[in-house]
Amino acid sequence: MSLERSGRGWHIKTIAALVWFAAGCASGASPAIPVGLDAYRMWGRWPMQRLGVRAYMRSTYDRTGGNETADASHFLYQFAPDRNVTLDVEGPGILYFVRYNHWHGSPWHYEIDGTDHIVQETSTADPLHPVENSTFLPRDLFPKPLAFTWSDTKGADLSWIPIGFEKTFRMAYSRTFYGTGYYIYHRFVDGTKLSRPIQSWDGRTPPSSDVLDLISKAGTDIAPAAGQSGMRQNHGKLALPRSQSRVVWTRSGSPGIIRALEFSIPRDQALAFSRARLRMTWDDRPQPSIDAPASLFFGAGILYNRDNREYLVKSFPMVIRYDATRVHLSCYLPMPFFGSARIELAGVPDVDLDDIDWSVRFGPLKDPANESSYLHATYRDHPQPEVGKDVELLDTRNVEGGGDWSGQFIGTSFIFSHDADLRTLEGDPRFFFDDSQTPQAQGTGTEEWGGGGDYWGGLNMTLPFAGHPVGARSAQEAKSAEDRVESAYRFLLADLMPFGKNAVIRLEHGGTNESTQHYETVAYWYGLPAASLIKTDEFSVGDDGSERQHNYVSPDASPPYEIESRYEWGPDTIQGMEVFPASKDRGRSTKGTSEFRLQIDPKNLGVMLRRKLDYSFLNQRAEVWVADPAAGKASWRKAGIWYLAGSNTCVYSFPPNRNELGATEHVLQTSNRRFRDDEFLIPSELTRGRSKIRVRIRFTPVETPLYPGGPAPSLAWSEIRYTAYSYVHPRFSGRDSARRVVSTSKTNIAPSD
């Protein structure tokens, strides 16, 4: 049952969820993690720690590491001629984002908990004659500003509508020509406190209008106003002499949070201000957590406005707006600190900047230090990307002193060419979290990551969470050298990517890491210098000593066998040069059960179990059971289903002659990448208070061939290595930083000139 107030879309269940959330915060208990549409409503909780949440980004990428047909039309398996499966998940979760290339592949099947929902767009009926101003269908379920089609994005159909599922989710394409896409979804440790229970999408209820109204405010001041909830605002004016630095604002003595940071400059100084350096330091840490060129931090590679647009960037957290005389740059990402904050600007060589207006809106921080996190913007310059190696935007193990960090990756702003060369955009995003050797996030291209398709048609666009704000269609059409600077941005809110130990963010440059374009990148992330996911045990299957140590029993397991293969790290050979060689490992496979014992942290909030496996076996599925080894007689409790769809053999279908309506093809492609890491989340009620657990894996085969009528697949459960990670509260209080600042709250601001 739901009740709507006309024109506002508030439901009883929405109000109840917010009351539940507020009550938890008021009681002093750990706050609930915002999920579903609450992730937008509660956007002020962007910095909060997401313990027990995992994000995954799956796609139609070329399994061989290349760029075949621009990473399109590679399917996990084909359930039927009009059911070409690209995503198959078992267990509760939320799909937060999907991206398709135009209408290709539509109608799309969203099979949720056994119910098939058809999603399509207005060009589906006659794809040979696409419809301008197209929309998703059903239109009311996929409205702007949470869904856009190629008419707005210049090449892609995008949806940020949360799609919940309680048991299973399967996505399939009805047509296969140019069927490309990537999808971001979250899984949760059962027992994690959420703002609302996960409920299956019903295919009938539109997103609430309060959320649509909120996201529609992108490009405006969305932060709490001064005077509300203790918010204050300081402002001033400064000059920035060439090659010199100026402190803009400082605050010390008590925990706080910046909710809005704004600069404005005369239009005739905009190009020079692009390269001014913005630095922000939290709690007197030795290095600034934000250290980036000003324009790139605010979402654009350069403050060059070819078409005299009002907005270069009209996103939800960042805005670059022009009026008749000035350029206004605004950031609304929440920025907590626990003792002090300092904002600085560093000038550029050969140019004096003056008449810089600034303002900072800030207020008290009420969250405990280990439940929040610092904002970071890590800048990297890549003038000559190395052939065969991804461009690395971030490795948290090597920033700000290194070590363990816990938080979430929330986006990028990056220049991908200084010469209007769009071909480098064929490169795929690859993101690795918490020691994984398999990317938890693997995309299909760089402009896809930036919300476009087909290089945005060379056009500029700006949306709440993705955009291509600057850059000409080609070097030949560029009006100046500044017009050749190409940049894109992508922000993650509901679809952010948590990590508990480390994050490695990479972009392939060109379709096979061969581009020589000059990249400059900013990776946005929240993080504390302490782990929330700690490695407590590791067990190597096939190693006699490790098997004895972990009480491994598997009556039907194969003898240990050696595998020589690779992980999915892009092309292994480029221009005749081997980029990364194969490696060897040992493991077993079983069609029965395996049992073993693992050590965990008794203060855990749940456990993540990672398995290294041989991905040559299709659709590996097993029941997972957990028992307390300290008990006299094992009492097994079911932890869930561990399912990994697909294998290193995929089905490729790309009808010839660009035939949109061509029949589905069944071309099997097997890659040389058999190694894969996969993850399973064990409910906290089965692990809390225990220092050891016994795990039972029972193989449950999925008798589905790669395509209807195809040969019977090779089925087994592969196990090479198991690693246990325990979720814990980060050991961080903020006190060490607070001791280095005065005990009385004090704010310093730059003097007006």
Predicted segments with their positions:
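TerminUS-proximal long segments
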Residues: 175, 198-202, 492, 496-573, ...
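Beta-strand-rich ligand-recognition modules
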Residues: 131-166, 306-332, 336, 447-498, ...
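Basic/polar N-terminal segments that are highly enriched at the extreme N-terminus
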Residues: 1-3, 25-31, 742-753
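Hydrophobic h-region of N-terminal signal peptides that target proteins for export
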Residues: 18-28, 487
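Ala/Thr-enriched low-complexity intrinsically disordered regions
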Residues: 14-16, 22, 747
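Bacterial N-terminal signal peptides that target proteins for export
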Residues: 2-15
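Beta-strand-centric surfaces of beta-sandwich/beta-rich domains
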Residues: 29-558, 562, 591, 613
